């Protein structure tokens, strides 16, 4: 019985993560080595701080998916930080709220927004890193 519950829980958790809108459109869970490599290569980088219970994050998800599909952002490296489970990364990047978006141009922070759900301003903010 316990094994059955464990398996069911694992399947549901995996399904939730896979279906999470923030992971759509080419986003990757934050990886320090990949982030450092992208910075060293001078790539444009977007970090989205996401929580599955956050309505603002859910509103941002289709905009971020559209952004990734835009040819202007074809070289963008897109990472997601989980607000609930990656507190060390929140401290590293000075994040205090879910729905925070941070754009980097190489190793320099180019722009940051919190709680923005307007397509034009998100595109403009991330555009500062391109």
Tell me what each language-model feature is.
Residues 19-21:
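N-terminal signal peptide c-region/cleavage motif recognized by signal peptidases
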Residues 41-52:
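Short active-site neighborhood of thiol/selenol oxidoreductases, capturing the structured segment around
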Residues 93-102:
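Structural micro-motif
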Residues 27-43:
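A short beta-strand-turn-helix
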Residues 3-8, 12:
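N-terminal export leaders
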Residues 105-130:
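Non-catalytic, surface beta->alpha helical segment in thiol-disulfide oxidoreductase systems
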Residues 73-87:
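Thiol-based oxidoreductase modules, predominantly thioredoxin-like and allied folds used
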Residues 58-70:
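Typically the conserved alpha-helix immediately C-terminal to a functionally engaged Cys/Sec
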């Amino acid at each position: 019985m316990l094994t059955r519950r464990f398996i069911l829980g694992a399947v549901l958790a995996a399904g939730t993560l896979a279906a999470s809108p923030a992971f759509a459109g080419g986003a990757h869970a934050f990886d320090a080595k990949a982030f450092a490599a992208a910075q060293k290569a001078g790539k444009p980088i977007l970090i989205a701080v996401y929580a599955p219970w956050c309505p603002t994050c859910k509103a941002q998800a289709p905009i971020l998916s559209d952004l990734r599909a835009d040819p202007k952002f074809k070289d963008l490296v897109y990472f997601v930080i989980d607000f609930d489970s990656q507190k060390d990364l929140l401290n590293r990047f000075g994040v205090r709220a879910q729905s925070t978006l941070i754009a980097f141009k190489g190793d320099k922070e180019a722009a940051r927004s919190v709680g923005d759900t307007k397509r034009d301003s998100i595109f403009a903010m991330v555009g500062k890193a391109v």
